[in-house]
Amino acid sequence: MHLYNEWLPPPVAEETKKEKESFARVVRCVKELHRPDDPESVYATLKWISVIELFVRAKSELSVEDVSELVEIGLQIFHSSENKLYAQVRWGNVLVRLINKFRKKLSLKVQWRPLYDTLIHAHFSRSPGPEGWRLRQRHFMAVTSLIRSCRRFFPQGAASEIWSEFMSLLENPWHNSSFEGSGFVRLFLPTNPENQDFFSEKWIKNVLELWDSIPNCQFWNSQWTSVLARVIKNCSFIDWESYLPMLFSRFLNMFEVPVANGSGSYPFSVDVPRNTRFLFSNRTTTPSKSIAQSIVYFLKPGSSAHEQLEKLVNLLEQYYHPSNGGRWTYSLERFLLHLVIAFQKRLQREQQDPDSLPATCLGKPERVAFVGVVLKLIDRGQYSKNEHLSETVAAATSMLSYVEPSLVLPFVASRFHLALETTTATHQLKTAMMSVAFAGRSILQSSMSTAKSQDLGGDVDDRMFLDLIGISLSNALLGMDANDPPKTLATMQLIGSIFSNMAVLDDSSDDLSFMTMASFSEWLDEFLCRLIALLQHLEPNSVINEGLSSSATSGTFLVEDGPYYYCMLEILLGRLSGSLYNQALKKISKFVQTNILPGAIAEVGLLCCACVHSTPEEAVAQIVEPMLLAVISSLKEIPVNGYGGKGSAETLVSNKQDKQTLSPALEAAIDYQLKVLSVAITYGGSSLLPYKGLLIEAISSAFNSSSWKVNGAGDHLLRSLLGSLILYYPIDQYKCLSRHPAAPALEEWISTKASSKDEQVAHSRWHVPTQEETQFANELLDLHLQSALDDLLSICQSNIHSDAGDEKTHLKVTLLRIDSTLQGVLSCLPDFRPSPRHDMVEDLQFFIAGASGSCVGSAEIREKTAITIHAACKYLLEKKSDDSILLILIIRIMDALGNYGSLEYDEWSNHRQAWKLESAAIVEPPANFITEFNSKGKRRPRWALIDKAYMHNTWRSSQSSYHLFRTDGNFSPPEPLTFLVDDLLTLCLHNYETVRVLAGKSLIKLLKRWPQLLSKCVLSLTENLRKPDVQEYVVLGSCAILSSHSVLKHLTTDPKSFSSFLLGILSSSHHESMKSQKAIIELFVKYNIHFAGLSRNILRSLESHVEGSTSGDLVSQIGSMSFDSSSLHWRYNLMANRVLLLLVMSSRIDPSFSLKILDETAGHFLKNLKSQLPQTRILAISALNILLKESPHKMQGKDQPSVSSQETENANSSLDLALSQIFREEGFFKETFESLSHIHITDTDSSSRGNHGSSSFQSMADKSITRFYFEFSASWPRTPSWISLLGSDIFYPSFARIFKRLAQECGVPVLLALKSPLEEFCNAKERPKQCVAAEALAGVLHSDVNGLFNEWDSWIMVQLQNVILGQSVESIPEWAACIRYAVTGKGKQGTKIPVMRQQILDCIVAPLPPTATTTVVAKRYAFLSAALIELSPPKMPVTEVKLHIVLLDELICNMSHSSAQIREAIGVILSVLCSNIRLRMSYQQEYPTEEGKTDVDSQLKEENWFKLISAKASEAVKNIQQASISDSLDTSTDVDMGNAQSNGDSLDDVKWMETLFHFIISSFKSGRASYLLDVIAGFLYPVMSLQETSHKDLSILAKAAFELLKWRVFPESHLQKVIGVILSSADDSNWRIRSSTLTYLRTFMYRHTFILTHEDKQKIWKTVEKLLVDSQVEVREHAAAVLAGLMKGGDEDFAADFRDRSYAEANSIQKRRNRRKSSSTQSIAGVHGAVLGLVASVLSVPYDMPSWLPEHVTLLARFAGEPTPIKSTVTKAVAEFRRTHADTWNIQKDSFTEDQLEILADTSSSSSYFA
């Protein structure tokens, strides 16, 4: 049994034993309801889902057989309800919960294919259903999480099936299907034991290759990282050693951090289509979790993973420092957190699985090493300004301190002392407090544990840690400050968490020796003084608001900002020993009696409450009794109304003569005392019985008072008293019952997953009401509920008040008393008894146990109250309908009456958010290496678990009877309840908004619980929308209720409500006011978003008009509304069209639906294309896209069997006829084109494509009506758009698709009808018109219908040629998009070739006439690039390959074209051509085909283009450089002819180079560079050397290419080539080139640090060192900066060697200087180089103080007297050193000697830092 259920109050715990039985009954019911032959039976099973969830959430003990049976049925139901997304969502979610909870006990086999089919059918197919996008989103989430849960049950061989299924999607990395493929692989690939044999070396190589094919794309990275992380974790047999350098290199480069002043994010990340990002987990940040998990599972004894991790941490640690925050902080913070969590989980797994191999387990040395590395990150991030990071650091410290206390605790201690010493940064103290609080338990355990399993090194350390706690507690006293909330809360958390560890707080015990400075009682005194001072100085948050809403506890930050205050008090007072408790109680009692603090009601109340909770008898005597007496004596002196229930009507009248008022001060005082009392007695229980008379008197006199404020306080007191008497709540919660076996001074903490040997966990004690208490409660009910009800009736029936004001007051007080008692007894007053149908008396079902207290009163009382309230409500609505306070009171009473259990539910949900119970301060991890004491789960203090059990009980009591009537149709709602519903229906249409909202909430809750009442409500509310003269507020109220989920769900199954709802909305256009229109539209949009299809019985009722029923004419009614001609407002016309579409789409699923309606609606929407209303046109486009299907006129491919002719004619003739009649009308298409061109808005700024671009004139609501989710899943283009020279187009693929479908539907007639309008519009002047023509042409060309060839030859080809040769420029983007659409490959992977592709390509490639202008040339190139992107390289037919070869030759000849625009186009096309060829070649090598060995392939293999370009490049660079040198020399005027000649050449070279740079840039931008790396590596030198030339454009391009190069990681195969280029250009004669080589080196080394070999690194170090003594100053300084970076980056041996050498060198120079004062013979460069070597060493450790640093800095400072370049270098470096070490200077200066400090002080201008 789960611990929480074991610890429930005894009466409830007894009941829970029946739950196993009742679950079995539920499973049987579901089984009976589900009939596999009838798919509609799914709807009947849905009502049981919430009941099944109940059992899961109640943590009941269920039998595994039942669960597995239910899961099997559930999966069947899930697969059989194919088109019912809503049912799949509900079943999917409940299955996920069941499978995850029982995953270790179930033995299922789940097939993956049906799940995949569901996913494809609902989200990746071209013809989706009508469901709203919110529902689709939920469906996607449900299906994917179901797949994740079922992965572990996939049978053997599933992995290889899945892999081969999705491999085909990954063939072409430049097609969007590859993103989908990676998403599917991540989602489906199982790593369960059955499938582990699939993961081989070959598979890993394959994955790494695939991963490399798309660079710089976080989506892609996160998919593959996640797959690998799972494999690494679960398949421990794979040896990863050889892949580590490569993987770590990947990991490092996935963190987008700024390297060497670069930017912190990818310059061009590859664009992932929106829907893929939306569907597959779309975190575009670094996949930190998977990286961390992989690294932790790499660690093994003897593996090199640890060194790699250390290197990674060395490179990343600087970005954790507070001064280096940025966008990357989030992913780094996650990385740290997941490293620690994964490490902890792995340790726990190894602890609990004793037979795991020692070879793979983490031993002591591995643990120490790991903790040591992570501490570096913790050290950097501890005082981060980023909230999350500093909290994560504290939590990580806490977890690691249980693993390796000897490393972590000294660190915590030193950090705490450091924070105490700094006076400037106060936020540090808060963080330091937090880390001590979080590590408190491990500090105490390691110092007090008697089993000293590992020695911390003598007593000194033990004392040190205990002192640390002592110091932190004494500092905590200073931390309580009313002006600094964060610090105050941190100190309270600290005190609470440390005392949670102690068994008892007492002076006499020796164990608490950490209170060195004073005895504990002194500390306690001081603490209470501070606390009282704090309470006296609190400022209340707001003016205490009058009226009902001011609860007793609207507190200040102590109560509002977290539970620490109350928690700390409870723990402290619960753990004190008897004598100390009395000492504290005296002090508190004195404080409470002498102070009145209306600003701190809640705080003082909680203080008293904690005292009472700890030992009720004494506290009640010392605190409650004096306060009660004081209040009663004050209450006697104030004026009364006497409506409070005591005394008869005569005395009332006599009291009334003098109306004196109450002084505000006295009123506030009484209010304060009553409210504090009400909080204080919350846990009083039976110890309140002696004061029964006093309490009754206090409450009655409070209600009798004439002040409303005092009445309200009386209400609090009554509520609290009732609760304290009859509810179940834990007592002794904070006492310590079991001590820790290893350290008796500490409390033992408990895990909820108790193993068998800890069974004797002490139960919690509950307050179970005694007979006297229930008797007292019943008396209170008589006094304040029964008598108040009689009063209420008498006021409403016999007018007893002549004065309206008196009547109002009396009503207010009477209602308040009723409300107060109902709120107090919660669900202890029995619920209404439902009336069974058919006179059968049957017992109520039982689902789960739960009660919040023992029963008082009877169901009759509830019924009587309801009937009285019904009468009162009627009276109020007649007489006092404008009095909102009375109405609100009455609604609250109705809520408490009707929604049985909802008050408990509210309390539970508020509490759930309030407690930060997961805080690391009170969690002890399962694997604890301090006490060598491991448990199955996390351990927590007993009080925290009791708190959870208490909340669990509250939740159970709210749910125990909630679902009884939802599943059982045998009961009809009791009569009083129907009264309440009628009243609430009237109230929720009230003209005051507050009243409407409250009544609405209450009504919706009631309807949820009694679904039988729904249809009545829906009918009456939709009637309100239809009536002509209804007030605005009635419309608003109706819409609010109608848009609730229960109503929307009800509409899918109930035909009558459905038709009344739709007609109600559509015929509500007569409401004038803006507000009501807005409400109606919002309701309609919400209906659309959540639309869940229609059930069969609604569709039947729609069709049944044949038999002459009424609702059948719904379709025709709506149809008549949706024509332009009807005089409706355009938005209603739009809504009618939308409803028509939804009906037709829903009905397509039903096979018996008549096709006639389908044809009619398709025709209707086709006509709407030329409608006058723009919105309706847009909707028509969506509709046609959905209704038109592919059809008989499409050409038959080779593989499809041809259909016999007469079949085709019958198959679709009806739709064909219906449509062709319409478009054969004269001028139909011309009009349509006209009206469509108006939708195209050429707004330059919006580059949003595909979303109808109609952003400018569509509001959000209209968008949701006109658009379908569908637009977003089958989106075009299917390849990434990265070519910027195409510009942004306004080409809408959905328009093109209509024309394509029309052509496929009706064949050649469409082509003929389109001919003349197309010819007219292609030559139009306006861009929108050309755009429509482009869309129509694209659709026709892509349609593949029979007879297209003839039309192509007769007129289409001519049209296309005209477009190419046309002079107009502005519509190029649209025509490029048209061509791109027309050649797009078909099928999911875009590999099926459209029939017309070859013809279109030939038409574009055909050479232009020699007279063509540059615009035409540029246009042709733009079209070419658009078309080439769409080709699918792996499977190109030979004709397309030949085309590539021809084009390559043409372009290489044109590379130095005179126009810049054309040069760019050539560069872009070259990158596409070359990468396409490369990809095809690599594909042919892997999967060679027989006919593939043609002459074409051998031509490709030679790669002539590569040789040509490379040769030309090196030559061009030389020429450009010489030219620029001769330019600078050539100042003479007489230029001879030869020179001019060479100048012209060099200009050609410049143009040629520009094209080459365009080629490089576009390869990077498009992500195609992976296939061209060897080519690009060859062009590294030109890019580096042409950064600074006299040709401005060239240099700009070179710089752009350079920025992109910095981000590229080269694989090992090309590294040698790159290093060769780097080394040679570092020796270049031009110093600018040397400098840019250094710039490149910094990032190059960072990106490749894991994969460079030792020799390569040595060469690079040597080269950089040589540049330290370069002749040019800039280069020298640059080299020093690079060296500092290299030294940070991990290669310790190189760094140490260099440091020693540079120190020796500088030292010898300094000594020589000292020997002879004269200037030395050494060159300035030499000395400067030596100094810079020192500078590099000093700057390489910006925040630490290693042992060698002081000497280096001092030596550096001695050079301050040198001549100019050296002097400034020294001063800058010392200043920088001082800046970065300023934070911790107080401690770090101890590592310097006095002399060294003096020398430093001389160099520094301001010596104040170095005091």
Curated annotation (Swiss-Prot):
Signal peptide: none annotated. GO terms for molecular function: lysine-acetylated histone binding; peptidase activator activity; proteasome binding. Disruption phenotype: No visible phenotype. GO terms for cellular component: proteasome complex. GO terms for biological process: DNA repair. InterPro entries: ARM-like, ARM-type_fold, Blm10_mid, PSME4, PSME4_C. HEAT repeats lie at residues 563-599, 1156-1193, 1442-1479, 1613-1650, 1655-1692, 1746-1783. Residues 1626-1711 are annotated as: Bromodomain-like (BRDL). The keyword DNA damage applies. Induction: Upon MG132 treatment. Keywords: DNA damage, DNA repair, Proteasome, Repeat. Associated component of the proteasome that specifically recognizes acetylated histones and promotes ATP- and ubiquitin-independent degradation of core histones during DNA damage response. Recognizes and binds acetylated histones via its bromodomain-like (BRDL) region and activates the proteasome by opening the gated channel for substrate entry. Binds to the core proteasome via its C-terminus, which occupies the same binding sites as the proteasomal ATPases, opening the closed structure of the proteasome via an active gating mechanism. Interacts with the 26S proteasomes. The bromodomain-like (BRDL) region specifically recognizes and binds acetylated histones. Belongs to the BLM10 family. This is Proteasome activator subunit 4.
